[in-house]
């Protein structure tokens, strides 16, 4: 039965929570989604800084106002138990890590995903819920050194259980299925091998994991708490509780027991007897018959001890006081109720008969630990602290009956503030929940009609401070009914302005959660919101509410609010001008054996990764945006099917069409550029930024491939296929008995990019004494665009390179994304870059053939952008852009491109071993990419170039090479001044979007005040 089954793995360590404390101050009115200042509703239109200053004055921020909701553990396995009562500390797993991670984010393609903790009711002390997306154990150090033994997916929320005296328990299951992976190293651990055998044979249906947190205190990082952590991993069987501890419940000082033959297993993971009590014994409650000794100091939480026959009596734990008096410490609650989904968010119904927003709650009843039929009474107890603006709810005399947050029902017809259900012989039952008014409440599920809260006031019955000490051992459900926002669906979509969006959606979170403004960007900045529409929607899409990365992490964004947000973001994406196109009548070489050759090859790898990223970006930008594509459809130039093919659905899902696929590949190439640089820096070289000239680049690289900036089409896609071609498709050429040509020593060319990386990989292993950085100080760590297959096996991977193992893994990682089947031979279901371009080529050819069969006019999937555009001229392989407007925009783009690279150079020059993902400089570089370069590029491809039949495009030309500025104060002023000049230049060009100017102003101000870090 759950954690009582064998084998068990015990672990311990610490847990860190970054739960935001601002909303817990009692100044948040959940019925209106508003905040309170001096007893009145604070207007959402007023600056958030004004409200933050008020909270400072009244002490309303708490200790973690900037908490971001992250939940993390640092734990290791302390013992395994394969036979009852036999604790083994010699198993291979002992000392190995236990990890909880968040869900994989398909849009950002992230590793190192954090689990979450959030309050269902932020005004309550009882509803802090954990959400975990991935669980694993078995790594030793980094997973590419000694990997995981097991990883698996986790679903749903993990409500708090057994809240008592600063202790709390969370439980979750990892069900068997496609999200579960046992690695080969499981065979080396008898305990892991047995767990695997049970699951794969069907004797068990997955794993169950308990986390017990206690003794909270300040954490080393700001806005966080650190807890003592103990936990247990055991087999799980379908039909057993997912989030509730199984067994016979004894309360208070909660523990559960499982009597089997001559022994009893006790779940003491959260048990702590009263001070001064010793000699704990498990006895029968009525006849006082001794059953077993209860160890009070076991380090593992779940223990098995010899036991006498228990019979059919209830159980109790008896102890002895310092004065020698025997007292009952805990007594069995003979009828218990389990509700796995005990953290509930309800959308407010549209009207009295709206059943679409109802929630069905599954219940299971137990009698002395075994499923059995029972009659259960369900009542509700609203939280007065959730209604600070309601004088009736907060009155000292208010009773639980004065306010109904939900209506309850068994049959779907008779709704009431309470209900009674009868479970079947298996203990199973269900009831329905419907929102009655916005706010927060708690449901009590009890086998007795009378409750210990009868006759108490609302505040006393809710017992936020646990004065009564009763709720911890009772079955309850935390319910949040979201505000009634259905009126937002009636707002005409063309009337959705940013001011309206901020007031009705963003303001609440800006007022209460500062981590967005401090760690990401402020939702009050219109230009930042308009810069990241797809990112914002993917995080806020209601379909992702069950994912850990969902925003807001509080999960209280209503459906109408989400649709209002989507309407605004789509409107911004449609605000484009489409040009009118009018017809006109007029490996295989000498192995790398020296450091010099290896460094040269790595620098070529860096140059190639940057070059392929830029040409993929150019091809992606040549495709009209979804908004522009809609205009082309309305003009009859595109069909709706062609719009879907090229641009996807406009951001509602992750389907970005061919354009989205190209951008996704380009993002991964940017990571390749960084990770190959990480290898280069690990061998003692500086961060390398090549100066690429697409007019001459093909004469300078080690691979005989064609690199150029040109529009997306069948020709360019075929070039991309050739670049990403796997090594197996490039072989030696033979003719009869003629010998295979052998390259000369000075010939450093390769047949493919794959051959180059293969040679680098061998060189890393061949050349001695390469790595000069200290272990753990590789730097350059980041976790974006790393794919779910990497996250499944290496959720801790963040690109660092500091030794041979991590360098080889980095090269394999780059090759895996390009070719596939490098890190694993298994089919991950993910496309390599090669596969992506083959698919795109097939789609384009299919569309061309369809057009020919239906005698449709020839279709172009892209704007007629110039091939290798330039503002400088020089050579027939580049097209000189002569239009003054286009040239002005190209110069602005190129200077922004320089600044993006300068910021990277400045980071690696000044802080080479610092976190890249936390770097102000790198984050500013990303802001330049997304907030300046992308909108300028999307504009440039629509502007006439001055050459017949061609539009302009971003040329990625550098007038000077970025170089590290050693003095931090000089660097700060220089960077700020350059951004200021760029902002002024952008301001004088009427075509430049306002958000670009604002982003440049923001960056100039940021470096003028903060400086690079």
UniProtKB/Swiss-Prot annotation:
Enzyme Commission numbers on file: 1.21.98.2, 1.11.1.6
Chain segments annotated as coiled-coil in the UniProt record: none
Domain of life: Bacteria
Keyword annotations: Heme, Iron, Metal-binding, Oxidoreductase
InterPro entries, alphabetized: Ferritin-like, VioB/RebD_dom
Reaction it catalyzes: 2 3-(7-chloroindol-3-yl)-2-iminopropanoate + H2O2 = dichlorochromopyrrolate + NH4(+) + 2 H2O + H(+); 2 2-iminio-3-(indol-3-yl)propanoate + H2O2 = chromopyrrolate + NH4(+) + 2 H2O + H(+); 2 H2O2 = O2 + 2 H2O
Gene Ontology MF terms in the entry: catalase activity; heme binding; metal ion binding; oxidoreductase activity, acting on X-H and Y-H to form an X-Y bond, with oxygen as acceptor
Cofactor: heme
Biological role stated in the UniProt entry: Involved in the biosynthesis of the indolocarbazole antitumor agent rebeccamycin. Catalyzes the hydrogen peroxide-dependent dimerization of two L-tryptophan-derived molecules (imine form of indole 3-pyruvate (IPA)), to form dichlorochromopyrrolic acid (CPA), the precursor for the six-ring bisindolopyrrolocarbazole scaffold of the rebeccamycin. The hydrogen peroxide is provided together with iminoindolpropanoate by RebO.
Description of how the protein assembles with itself and partners: Homodimer.
Family: Belongs to the RebD family.
Protein name: Dichlorochromopyrrolate synthase
Organism in which the protein naturally occurs: Lentzea aerocolonigenes
Lineage: Bacteria, Bacillati, Actinomycetota, Actinomycetes, Pseudonocardiales
Gene: rebD
């Amino acid at each position: 039965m759950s954690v009582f089954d064998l084998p068990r793995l015990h672990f311990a360590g610490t847990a860190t929570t970054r739960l935001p404390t601002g909303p817990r101050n009692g100044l948040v009115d959940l019925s209106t989604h508003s905040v309170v200042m001096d007893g009145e509703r604070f207007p959402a239109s007023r600056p958030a800084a004004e409200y933050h200053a008020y909270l400072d004055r009244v002490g309303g921020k708490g200790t973690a106002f900037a908490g971001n909701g992250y939940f993390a553990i640092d734990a290791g396995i302390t013992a395994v138990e394969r036979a009852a009562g036999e604790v083994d500390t010699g198993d291979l797993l002992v000392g190995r890590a236990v990890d909880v991670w968040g869900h994989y984010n398909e849009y950002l393609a992230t590793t190192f995903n954090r689990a979450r903790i959030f309050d269902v009711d932020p005004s309550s002390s009882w509803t802090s819920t954990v959400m975990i997306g991935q669980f694993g154990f078995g790594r030793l150090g980094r997973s590419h050194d000694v990997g995981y033994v097991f990883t698996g997916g986790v679903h749903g929320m993990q409500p708090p259980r057994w809240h008592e005296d600063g202790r709390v328990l969370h439980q979750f299951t990892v069900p068997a299925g496609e999200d579960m992976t046992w690695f080969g190293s499981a065979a080396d651990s008898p305990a892991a091998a047995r767990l695997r055998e049970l699951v794969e044979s069907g004797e068990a249906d997955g794993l169950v994991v308990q986390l017990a947190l206690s003794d909270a205190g300040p954490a080393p990082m700001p806005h966080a708490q650190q807890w003592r952590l103990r936990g247990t991993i055991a087999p799980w069987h379908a039909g057993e509780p997912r989030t509730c501890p199984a067994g016979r419940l004894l309360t208070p000082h909660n523990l559960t027991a499982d009597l089997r033959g001559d022994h009893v297993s006790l779940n003491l993971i959260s048990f702590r007897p009263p001070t001064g009590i010793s000699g704990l014994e498990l006895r029968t409650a009525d006849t006082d018959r001794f059953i077993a000794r209860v160890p009070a100091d076991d380090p593992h939480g779940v223990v098995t001890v010899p036991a006498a026959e228990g019979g059919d009596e209830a159980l109790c734990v008896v102890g002895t006081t310092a004065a020698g008096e025997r007292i009952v410490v805990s007594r069995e609650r003979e009828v218990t109720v389990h509700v796995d989904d005990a953290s509930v968010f309800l959308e407010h119904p549209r009207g009295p008969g709206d059943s679409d927003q109802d929630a069905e709650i599954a219940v299971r009843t137990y009698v002395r630990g075994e499923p059995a039929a029972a009659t259960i009474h369900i009542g509700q107890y609203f939280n007065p602290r959730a209604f600070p603006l309601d004088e009736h709810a907060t009155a000292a005399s208010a009773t639980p009956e004065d306010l109904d947050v939900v209506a309850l029902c068994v049959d779907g017809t008779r709704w009431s503030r309470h209900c009674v259900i009868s479970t079947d012989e298996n203990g199973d039952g269900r009831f329905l929940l419907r929102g009655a008014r916005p706010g927060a409440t708690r449901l009590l599920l009890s086998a007795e009609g009378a409750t210990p809260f009868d006759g108490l006031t609302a505040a006393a019955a809710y017992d936020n401070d646990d004065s009564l000490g009763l709720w911890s051992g009772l079955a309850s459900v935390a319910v949040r009914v979201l505000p009634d926002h259905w009126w937002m669906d009636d707002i005409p979509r063309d009337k959705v302005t940013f001011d309206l969006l901020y007031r009705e959606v963003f303001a609440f979170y800006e007022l209460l959660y500062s981590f967005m403004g401090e760690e990401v960007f402020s939702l009050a900045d219109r230009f930042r919101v308009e810069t990241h529409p797809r990112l914002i929607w993917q995080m806020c899409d209601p379909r992702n509410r069950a994912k850990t990365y969902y925003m807001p992490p509080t999960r209280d964004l209503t459906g109408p609010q989400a649709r209002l947000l989507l309407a605004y973001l789509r409107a911004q994406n449609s605000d484009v001008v489409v040009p009118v196109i009018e017809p006109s009548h007029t490996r295989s070489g000498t192995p790398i054996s020296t450091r010099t050759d290896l460094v040269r090859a790595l620098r070529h790898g860096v140059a190639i990764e940057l070059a392929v990223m830029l040409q993929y970006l150019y091809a992606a930008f040549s495709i009209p945006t979804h908004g522009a594509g809609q205009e082309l459809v309305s003009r009859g130039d595109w069909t709706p099917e062609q719009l879907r093919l090229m641009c996807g659905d406009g951001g509602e899902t992750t389907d970005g069409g061919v354009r989205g696929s190209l951008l996704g590949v380009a993002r991964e190439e940017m990571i390749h550029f960084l990770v190959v640089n990480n290898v280069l820096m690990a061998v003692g070289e500086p961060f390398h930024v090549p100066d690429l000239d697409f007019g001459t680049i093909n004469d300078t690289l080690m691979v005989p491939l064609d690199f150029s900036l040109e529009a997306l089409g069948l020709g360019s896609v075929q070039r991309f296929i050739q670049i990403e071609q796997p090594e197996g498709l490039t072989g030696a050429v033979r003719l009869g008995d003629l010998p295979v040509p052998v390259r000369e020593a000075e010939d450093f060319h390769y047949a493919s990019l794959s051959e180059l990386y293969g040679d680098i990989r061998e060189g890393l292993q061949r050349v001695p004494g390469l790595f000069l950085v200290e272990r753990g100080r590789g730097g350059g760590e980041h976790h974006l665009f790393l794919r779910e297959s990497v996250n499944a096996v290496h959720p801790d991977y963040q690109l660092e390179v500091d030794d041979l193992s991590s360098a080889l893994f980095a090269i394999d990682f780059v090759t895996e994304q390009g070719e596939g089947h490098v890190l694993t031979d298994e089919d991950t279901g993910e496309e390599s870059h090669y596969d992506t371009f083959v698919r795109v080529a097939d789609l384009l050819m299919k569309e061309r053939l369809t057009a020919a069969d239906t005698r449709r006019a020839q279709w172009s999937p892209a704007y007629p952008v110039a091939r290798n555009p330039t503002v400088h001229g020089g050579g027939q392989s580049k097209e000189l852009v002569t239009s003054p407007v286009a040239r002005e925009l190209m110069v602005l783009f190129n200077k922004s491109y320089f600044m993006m690279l300068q910021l990277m150079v400045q980071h690696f020059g000044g802080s080479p071993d610092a976190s890249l993902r936390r770097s102000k400089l790198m984050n500013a570089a990303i802001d330049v990419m997304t907030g300046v370069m992308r909108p300028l590029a999307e504009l440039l491809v629509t502007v006439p170039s001055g050459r017949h039949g061609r539009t302009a495009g971003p040329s990625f030309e550098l007038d000077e090479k970025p170089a590290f500025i050693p003095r931090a104060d000089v660097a700060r002023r220089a960077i700020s001044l350059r951004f200021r000049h760029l902002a002024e230049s952008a301001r004088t060009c009427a075509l430049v979007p306002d958000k670009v100017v604002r982003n440049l102003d923001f960056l100039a101000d940021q470096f003028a005040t903060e400086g690079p870090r």
